[in-house]
Structure formats: C-alpha cells, structure tokens
Swiss-Prot record:
Protein name: Alpha-N-acetylgalactosaminide alpha-2,6-sialyltransferase 1
Reactions mediated catalytically: a beta-D-galactosyl-(1->3)-N-acetyl-alpha-D-galactosaminyl derivative + CMP-N-acetyl-beta-neuraminate = a beta-D-galactosyl-(1->3)-[N-acetyl-alpha-neuraminyl-(2->6)]-N-acetyl-alpha-D-galactosaminyl derivative + CMP + H(+); a 3-O-[N-acetyl-alpha-D-galactosaminyl]-L-seryl-[protein] + CMP-N-acetyl-beta-neuraminate = a 3-O-[N-acetyl-alpha-neuraminosyl-(2->6)-N-acetyl-alpha-D-galactosaminyl]-L-seryl-[protein] + CMP + H(+); a 3-O-[N-acetyl-alpha-D-galactosaminyl]-L-threonyl-[protein] + CMP-N-acetyl-beta-neuraminate = a 3-O-[N-acetyl-alpha-neuraminosyl-(2->6)-N-acetyl-alpha-D-galactosaminyl]-L-threonyl-[protein] + CMP + H(+); a 3-O-[beta-D-galactosyl-(1->3)-N-acetyl-alpha-D-galactosaminyl]-L-seryl-[protein] + CMP-N-acetyl-beta-neuraminate = a 3-O-{beta-D-galactosyl-(1->3)-[N-acetyl-alpha-neuraminosyl-(2->6)]-N-acetyl-alpha-D-galactosaminyl}-L-seryl-[protein] + CMP + H(+)
Region named Disordered: 138-161
Similarity field: Belongs to the glycosyltransferase 29 family.
Pathway annotation: Protein modification; protein glycosylation
Organism: Gallus gallus (Chicken)
Location of this chain's protein in the cell: Golgi apparatus membrane
GO CC field: Golgi membrane
Glycosites: 66, 132, 192, 275, 286, 306, 329, 333
Tissues where this protein is expressed: Heart, kidney, testes, brain, liver and lung.
Length: 566
C-alpha cells in the first residue's frame, strides 16, 4: 500500500483517497461475508420499504386484533381505536368542566389517517353473507357518525341524539338545572337489548354492521336505556311528582271521611290526593305512558323492564269501571261512612282479642302471610281484600303452610290487590292471565302454575293491579326514606303492609289499622303467629322507623285509628 502511495503524483491526492476508501470497503465487505455480519451492518440502509408494510410490522405486535387475515389493516380495528379514544376522553373529563369538554374528541395521528384512506374493509368472520369490499374509510366514517352515538358517561341520558344531564338527588341545591324533562312522544329503543322489545331501531346497512366495534360499541340511533345501576342515588325528574288523576268516581258523602279530614289537616292538605288513579288496566297503557314510566324503577315504573312483557300483561287487564270501587258499590243514597280494618301481621296482635272488632268493619284488608286458623280471636275471620306481591304470596304459602296458611283467602266477594314490585311479578302475572306455567327462573320453584293458587270461580274482574303512579305517590309523599339518598337506594321500598294500609286510606271513609308497628314494638314478636319470640329485624329494604312515625301521626291527627298497647 505504501509503495502505491509513493508512486502517485502529488497532485492526485483526491484520487489517492478514493482508492484508499475503495480498498478499505472491499476488505471490510470480504471479512463481513466470512463471519455473516453483513445483515447487522447494513440493516440501517434498508429504508425503501412500503408504507403499508411498515404499518404491518410496527403495529401488528402491539394490536394484532386490528389486522385482517391477509395482513392488511382492518377497518374494524381502526374504528374501534377511535371510538375507544373518544370514549376515554369523555369519561376522563372532570364533572366540573363545561359541556364543551364533554364533546371533545381525539383526532387520529397522521400515519393512521394516511393508512385509513387505502384500507381494505374486512368484516368479522361471524358476519355472514357480506362480501369483502374496498372502500374509502373517510366516507364510511361519515356515514357511521350519522348513525352512531358514543356510549355516555353514567348520569348522562340520550334524547333525540343530544346529550342531557340526568339529575341526581345530591344535586337538589340546583334543582332547576338538575332535572330533565324528556320528550314522551319519542319511541324508546333499548341499547344492547337482546330481549324481544317493542320499538326497534332501523336496521343499519351491512357495511355499518361489519365495522361496528365489539367492546367499545356505539349504538345505532338508540336512546340510552335507563338503568338503576347508573345512579348513585334515586334519580329525580321534573315530572317525578306528577300523577294520573281520576275524575269519574263518585264523591264520598261521609262528613268524617279520610278525605274530609285530610282537607282540614295542615300536614295532609297539600299531600293527599283523593282522586288519584289507584289501579292500572289496559286503558291506561300506551307508548307515551311507557316512555314516561320507564324513568322510574319498579314498583314505581317500568325501568329495566321488557316492553313486550309489560304490554302483554297490561293488554289483558280488564278495565276497572270505577277507581273508587267501594263508593261505587254503595247502594244507599243515605249518608253513610264506609269502614275498613287493615290487618297487618305484627306480633302486637298476639293475645289481643281484636278479632271481633276487626270483623265488625264493612271491609277487611289482609296482607301476605295472613294466617287465620288458630288466631281467630285475635285477627278475626273476615276477608274482603288480600294484598300481596308475587314473592310474598308464594313464599308465605311455602313457609307458613305448617302454621295454617295453606291457601290464600278465597271467596266470592274477595278482591285481590297485586303490587308489582319487580320483573318476576310481571312474569308471574302473565302466567296467571294465560293460565300457563310460569317461566323457569321466575318463582317457578314455588309452584309452576299461578292460577292453581286461586279458586275455580276466579276471574280477572276480582283482580286489581296497583298503578305505578299511585305507588310512587305513596313513596314520594308519605314514605320517602333517607335510604333513597344512599348507594343502595334501589333496595328500598315501603313494606307490602304499608302499601296496603295507604291504599285503604284512599278507598275507605274510616280506617283502623291492626298489627302495624308502634312505639314499644320491641316487646312483641315479629309476627302474631310466631310460636317462639322473634325480634323484628330492620333491614335496609324497608324503613320501619319511618313507617312507625307516619302511622303515629295519622293516628294523632285522627285520620285513622292505630291499634296500640299501653
């Protein structure tokens, strides 16, 4: 090498260095080939790869689910990522920020935007009958945005495609802003509902179905279905205290009636509604009523219930000629007062000797496990109305048969009042109306056919179903427990006995209550038919203290008579 350099002319330095670099490169290449090092040394020089191949290599390890079988980017994956980003932006927005923050979306990065323009749309394998097509992502996305809405944050309702804030009880200090009035004329379509429901959204085209995300799915023109789990406390609406009133029933002529006394009471004057609709039937049910009552959880409405089930049950309930059926049945024009005894199952009745006094009333109301045999001297024998929920009826027959309650009260003149507290009540009532076995999983272990619980002369004209409006009115105005402001608000409802007593106060002129909780209840067993003393346990699903206070006040204001022991 030195010899060659010395023989070169001095003015050829450029040529000399080029020769040195060439020889040096040749030597390095030769040694690399011998030891297999050419890949690592020249790997950085491979820069002429296609954009599609780079996306495949760079991304496939991180998001393999976003790719189709042939290695090209799947439109489904891109749309899922965008929906996921938009959803997380909405969820992470602090509640104190304005509505503009809730509408914020994330724009995809430039590399994804470039790739989306030339993607091949490949549907999921389970989507049958859809041919693979190549389409512009931008146009598909635009069509999709018109048909889809992002899943809202809990506490946010969807109405006509616009997001509105659902009021929660904790926001009462700003009541005007905290309540929402929906449009009842709007048909309801339930998101992610697999049940056979009434209103169905228009079927989207196959291309839209194919690209709909699986996990972070947007709903196609569907109003968000209200769920109790989305509310930390009982939701409040600006129509929460509005009810259907009845103007067709006769007016009481009794000057000492509950209505007359309530009108003179400073406490009840603005609370008591003497003409509220008590019972529901097919004439009270339509799409508008479904939309309204779907905002309230059972027994106060239809939240989370299936429209088809509710509609089938309601359509089979015969119309009630009169809501005030006792006043309508009064045959005399002479001013008389209708007296009613409402018999609870409290231990205070044990050895009370109230049986004869109870039977002296015009009508006697009994509830759930109304054991009579062996306790006639304490609770009487007469029954005019029997109130229950599906569960309280079947469980009482199951658990109290050995104590004498082997069948529900039956007779020619007995009427039944059903308080529909949950979906199982609608399933049970449907089976009763159709005279069929109840569906498996809905109280069927207590007996398959509900009609077997009634006598052979049973007709639906003897069967009354409490209107959800009426039950919500009782809860809102008389038994609004503080438990409704707690996370377990959905568990609370007034006791079945409380619902029956308040129903009697809206049907009768004079009411006497027996076997209800009073001061000093600790001295008595839970039930009058208990063979051994059992303490009354206060569970969160009922508010016995509140009921005790209400009964005491009604008694003190001479609205009703409450049986108490000194």
């Amino acid at each position: 090498m030195g010899f060659l350099i010395r023989r070169l002319p001095k003015d050829s330095r450029i040529f000399r260095w080029l020769l040195i670099l060439t020889v040096f490169s040749f030597i390095i290449t030769s040694f690399s080939a011998l030891f297999g090092m050419e890949k690592s040394i020249f790997r950085q020089l491979k820069i002429y790869q296609s954009i599609a191949h780079m996306l495949q290599v760079d991304t496939q390890d991180q998001q393999g689910s976003n790719y189709s079988a042939n290695g090209r980017i799947s439109k489904v994956g891109l749309e899922r990522d965008i929906a996921w980003l938009e959803l997380n932006t909405a969820v992470s927005t602090p509640s104190g920020e304005g509505k503009e923050e809730q509408k914020k979306t994330v724009k995809p990065v430039a590399k994804v935007e470039e790739a989306k323009e030339k993607v091949t749309v490949k549907p999921f394998p389970e989507v049958m009958g859809i041919t693979n097509t190549t389409a512009s992502t931008a146009s598909v996305v635009e069509r999709t945005k018109e048909k889809t809405t992002a899943r809202p944050v809990p506490g946010v309702g969807e109405a006509d495609g616009k997001r509105t804030t659902i009021a929660l009880p904790s926001m009462k200090e700003d009541k005007e802003k905290a309540t929402v009035k929906p449009s009842f004329g709007m048909k309801v379509a339930h998101a992610n509902s697999t049940s056979k429901d009434k209103p169905k959204a228009e079927e989207p085209p196959a291309s839209v179905k194919a690209i709909r995300p699986v996990t972070q799915a947007a709903t196609v023109t569907e109003k968000k279905k209200l769920r109790a789990a989305d509310f930390k406390t009982e939701p409040q609406w600006d129509f929460d205290d509005e009810y259907i009133l009845d103007s067709s029933s006769p007016v009481s002529t009794c000057s000492e009636s509950v209505r007359a006394k309530a009108a003179k009471s400073d406490w009840l004057r603005d609370l008591f509604l003497p003409n509220i609709t008590l019972f529901i039937d097919k004439s009270y049910f339509n799409v508008s009523e479904w939309d309204r009552l779907e905002h309230f959880a059972p027994p106060y409405g239809f939240m989370e219930l299936n429209y088809s089930l509710v509609e089938e049950v309601m359509s089979r309930l015969p119309p009630n000629p009169h809501q005030q059926l006792l006043l309508a049945n009064s045959s005399s024009n002479v001013s008389t007062c209708i007296s009613c005894a409402v018999v609870g199952n409290g231990g205070i009745l044990n050895n009370s000797g109230m049986g004869q006094e109870i039977d002296s009333h015009d009508y006697v109301f009994r509830v759930s496990g109304a054991v009579i045999k062996g306790y006639e001297k304490d609770v009487g024998t007469k029954t005019s109305f029997y109130g229950f929920t599906a569960y309280s009826l079947v469980s009482s027959l199951q658990n109290l048969g050995h104590k004498g309650f082997k069948k529900i009260p039956q007779g020619k003149h007995i009427r039944y009042i059903h308080f529909l507290e949950a979906v199982r009540d609608y399933e049970w009532l449907k089976a009763l109306l159709l005279d069929k076995d109840i569906r498996k999983g809905f109280l069927n272990y207590y007996g398959r056919r509900p009609r077997e619980r009634f006598d052979e002369d049973f007709t639906m004209n003897k069967y009354l179903v409490a209107h959800p409006d009426f039950l919500r009115y009782l809860k809102n105005r008389f038994l609004k427990s503080k438990n409704l402001q707690k996370p377990y608000w959905r568990l609370y409802r007034p006791t079945t006995g409380a619902l029956l007593l308040l129903t009697a106060l809206h049907l009768c002129d004079r009411v006497s209550a027996y076997g209800y909780i009073t001061e000093g209840h600790q001295k008595y067993s839970d039930h009058y038919y208990d063979k051994e003393w059992k303490r009354l346990v206060f569970y969160v699903n009922h508010d016995f203290n509140l009921e005790k206070q209400v009964w005491k006040r009604l008694h003190d204001e001479n609205i009703m008579k409450l049986y108490q022991r000194s």
